[in-house]
């Protein structure tokens, strides 16, 4: 029973570790997406969220942070997206393709390390020319000067929560595993207790039955003992018979039958 508990505990820890270990991915609408995707499609590159939103009036209120990765701040049902440079140089929304997180995140992370390094080096000269100049939009430039200061703290907090939060599905799976483990342990304990009690009861009943049988068979043993068998007595009658004796001389009577002497 202890071995079963240890195995169940190790399995639950492995599942939880696998869920926590998906640091290179994030949850969105029940799906797991790569966290370091910087290209929505081949040949395109995502723009920095703060720089792109500063030049758009219809940008989502809750930004995705100070980075150039695919995110879904407005909860688009199509999935994560990012801003790319349009034909007129104005940032436009573009859904990200091939963003599903693989089964093993440890194998997928090395493939994108080069892209992360390129994005961390800073925007090149071509990317700087894509954004609209500040003097072209005087009314928006003032808002752009104030909005990043307020939005950075909020977006950094959201980004930190994305890395630590497992999502609703992760919590549901964890709670379900704990409930299953507890139910299995309780079932093992109840089954063992029931079987042990049943065995003890059978042993007690068997002893009681043996005692009753001894009480019943003890008086009969005296009658079945061969030393105590009753033997029928036979009466032997002895008859005494008188044998005839021959008369000897000197024994004849002097008187005859008639009673006369000398006759």
Curated annotation (Swiss-Prot):
Residues 1-21 form the signal peptide. The keyword Disulfide bond applies. InterPro entries: Kringle (IPR000001), Kringle-like (IPR013806), Kringle_CS (IPR018056), Kringle_sf (IPR038178). It is a single-pass type I membrane protein. Residues 22-168 are extracellular. Residues 242-251 have a biased composition (Polar residues). It is found in: Cell membrane. The keyword Disulfide bond applies. This is Phosphoinositide-3-kinase-interacting protein 1. N- and O-glycosylated. O-glycosylated with core 1 or possibly core 8 glycans. N-glycan heterogeneity at Asn-66: dHex1Hex5HexNAc4 (major) and dHex1Hex6HexNAc5 (minor). Residues 24-101 form the Kringle domain. The lineage of its organism: Eukaryota, Metazoa, Chordata, Craniata, Vertebrata. Negative regulator of hepatic phosphatidylinositol 3-kinase (PI3K) activity. GO terms for cellular component: extracellular space; plasma membrane. Glycans are attached at residues 39, 66. The chain crosses the membrane at residues 169-189. One of its GO terms (molecular function) is phosphatidylinositol 3-kinase inhibitor activity. Residues 190-263 are cytoplasmic. GO terms for biological process: negative regulation of phosphatidylinositol 3-kinase/protein kinase B signal transduction. PROSITE patterns: KRINGLE_1, KRINGLE_2.
